[in-house]
């Protein structure tokens, strides 16, 4: 069994000298897979003292983050997931503020927020306002956040505006780290020496938090007081923070023969095999046909390969799109390491391209559009396929296109928990975006590049850069790539579509379209920019009118010249 993140937390809050409690705090320290893939959340908020809605605002800010964060996709990064929850909560608070006190934020749903999400070997800090997160360093408290205060007033807070600037910071964790989250009623009156002394007296972190609150009161605090003391007891083993236990524990089953069963799936016949896996047609307990995938024996002793195999099934179970191969339901817990998906009768796009060497523009556009729809489903979950090529696209008898094979998928949230799981360079050089080879930033635009290569190949039978991409080793090499136009006497590709392909295939990712939808639109009709740059002259659009105009001008010039000569 691998080591997981282990945390200890103590909390205490007191109304103090104020007539009502306007602070709120909360935390959730999950276990198992949820801890590995989402992490632990610790947060506190301080409502502004001038508002009768301060407590509600603080409670909403903390409560929404602690609960709604865990409802976001596991594939999202912490910054995306927590950032969207905080932004949505802020919009709700701002809406309430406008309803009860339009133009007067001092009486609105306004509060501070300071939160930590601890995932893997990192902590993510989210901060708005003048609450504080600090780390104990010797006998000192190292502030990890800055106060958003100007002229004694909050310059940034939840509920003041529909748009919110969130301070986000990532810091590495070490076993033994101690963090202190406080509202201003506490941190203005206690020191690192106070925290260190309290920790030396007791191992009870709740008692430590209570002691700090009591000290602040004794030293004259007249505000509400909240303190959270968080200690990192152990860090997860490197590279095993997510998907590690199941991949390590489950045995690789022996290759089954027709008629044999694995967890209720009855094997019918082999479908395909490769160096990584063997795929069988099987019958599920409900009678439906499924594809049963078993890892090859070569990966049995490779922990990373086992985790990546399991990640394929993990990805399939988190995408809901008619253009992405779906995972099939499991009748119960797995007894062995395998994956199971829907069975689709069809051909790969590679075979389809062989059978249709000269597709119409509409046929090519239809396939590209469906692949793009599947990619968008992945990208919305912060996943990059990384191996889009004709062999990994399936077309069934009805013409529905599906993306298959998730062995190279990069999942931002999993990579965050398990650095290095993404492994070696994915994909096939002919379809690999040059940034993978040059070390440039990889993003969803890398998938768009591969899709554009496929579109180009369907329409021309060629590759836009030939074998040039395989020789890229630096940014300089990347920018030297020379695009080969798709327009020639053998293709029916119009100039405006060639420009659309060239843009999606630009060596610089930032010069490619800003969205897949923009790329698709540019394949259907000339872009406004292209039309402006290639507006046909009158002589080409209406030769008769052009020459009539020229003749009229020449006649007028002749009359003027004759008049001058006659005079």
In which residue ranges do the predicted regions lie?
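PP2C/PPM-type serine/threonine phosphatase catalytic domain
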Residues: 1-291, 297-311, 318-320, 332-338, ...
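Conserved HxN/HPN-centered segment at the entrance to the catalytic loop
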Residues: 320-328
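Conserved short submotifs of the Hanks-type protein kinase catalytic core
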Residues: 334-348, 352
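Conserved short alpha-helix within the protein kinase catalytic core
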Residues: 361-372
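Protein kinase catalytic-loop region centered on the HRD/HxD motif
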Residues: 373-383
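Regulatory activation segment
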Residues: 415-426
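C-terminal lobe helix-coil module of Hanks-type protein kinase domains
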Residues: 430-530
């Amino acid at each position: 069994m691998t080591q997981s993140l282990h945390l200890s937390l103590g909390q205490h809050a007191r109304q103090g000298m104020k007539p009502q409690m306007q602070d709120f705090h909360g935390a959730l320290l999950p276990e198992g897979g949820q801890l590995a893939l989402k992490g632990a959340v610790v947060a506190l908020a301080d409502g502004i003292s001038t508002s009768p809605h301060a407590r509600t605002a603080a409670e909403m800010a903390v409560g929404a983050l602690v609960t709604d964060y865990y409802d976001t996709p596991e594939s999202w990064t912490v910054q995306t997931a927590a950032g969207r929850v905080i932004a949505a909560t802020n919009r709700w608070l701002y809406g309430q503020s406008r309803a009860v006190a339009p133009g007067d934020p001092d009486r609105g749903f306004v509060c501070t927020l300071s939160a930590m999400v601890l995932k893997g070997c990192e902590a993510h800090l989210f901060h708005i306002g003048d609450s504080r997160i600090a780390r104990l360093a010797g006998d000192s408290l190292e502030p990890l956040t800055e106060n958003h205060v100007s002229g004694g007033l909050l310059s940034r807070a939840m509920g003041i505006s529909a748009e919110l600037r969130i301070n986000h910071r990532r810091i590495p964790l070490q076993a033994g780290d101690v963090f202190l989250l406080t509202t201003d009623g506490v941190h203005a009156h206690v020191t690192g020496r106070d925290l260190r002394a309290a920790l030396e007296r007791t191992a009870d972190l709740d008692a430590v938090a209570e002691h700090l609150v009591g000290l602040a009161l004794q030293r004259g605090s007249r505000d509400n007081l909240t303190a959270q003391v968080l200690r990192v007891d152990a860090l997860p083993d490197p590279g095993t923070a997510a998907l590690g236990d199941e991949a390590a524990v489950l045995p690789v089953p022996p290759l089954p023969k027709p008629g044999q069963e694995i967890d209720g799936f009855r094997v019918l016949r082999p479908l395909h095999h490769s160096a990584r896996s063997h795929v069988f047609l099987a019958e599920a307990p409900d009678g439906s046909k499924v594809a049963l995938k078993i890892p090859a024996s070569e990966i049995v002793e490779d922990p990373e390969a086992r985790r990546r195999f399991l990640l394929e099934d993990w990805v399939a179970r988190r995408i809901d799109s008619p253009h992405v191969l779906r995972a099939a339901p499991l009748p119960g817990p797995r007894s062995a390491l395998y994956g199971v998906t829907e069975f689709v009768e069809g051909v790969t796009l590679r075979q389809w391209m062989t059978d249709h060497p000269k597709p119409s523009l509409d046929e090519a556009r239809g396939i590209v559009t469906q692949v793009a729809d599947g990619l968008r489903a992945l990208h919305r979950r912060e996943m990059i396929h990384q191996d889009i090529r004709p062999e990994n696209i399936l077309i069934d008898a009805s013409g529905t296109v599906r993306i298959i094979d998730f062995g190279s998928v990069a999942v931002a949230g999993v990579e965050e928990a398990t650095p290095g799981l993404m492994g070696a360079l994915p994909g096939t050089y002919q379809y690999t975006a040059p940034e993978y080879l040059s070390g440039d930033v990889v993003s969803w635009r890398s998938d768009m590049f591969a899709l554009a290569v496929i579109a180009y190949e369907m329409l021309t039978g060629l590759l836009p850069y030939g074998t040039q991409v395989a020789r890229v080793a630096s940014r300089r090499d990347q920018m030297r790539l020379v695009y080969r136009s798709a327009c020639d006497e053998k293709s029916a590709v119009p100039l405006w579509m060639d420009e659309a392909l060239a843009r999606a295939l630009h060596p610089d990712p930032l010069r490619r379209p800003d969205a897949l939808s923009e790329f698709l639109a540019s394949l259907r009709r000339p872009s406004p920019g292209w039309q402006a740059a290639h507006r046909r002259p009158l002589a080409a659009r209406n030769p008769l009118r052009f020459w009539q105009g020229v003749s009229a001008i020449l006649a007028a010039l002749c009359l003027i010249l004759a008049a001058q000569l006659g005079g």
